[in-house]
Amino acid sequence: MAAKSAVNGLTKSLALEYGPSGITVNAVPPGFIDTPMLRKAEENGFLGDIEKTIAATPVRRIGKPEDIAAACAFLVSEEAGYITGQIFGVNGGRNT
């Protein structure tokens, strides 16, 4: 939790510092994302039962790398020019 709080604080501080220059700063903490690293951790018994994780996620699935990419693409677009200092969780609604 300390690292999470540090990233949140850094995001907000940088947004305040760079906002006057027209630079937005946001964070995108991911939920469980289906990557080779996640599957390897599952195979090695580091994650427990992935199906329980899916069941505890409101959208009932593991995220895809494309989910993270879509959020980042939005946040760097002109449409998100008024969004700064935010923690934009891409986690299927599962907040930990």
Region locations from a protein language model:
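Active-site loop of short-chain dehydrogenase/reductase
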Residues: 20-23, 86
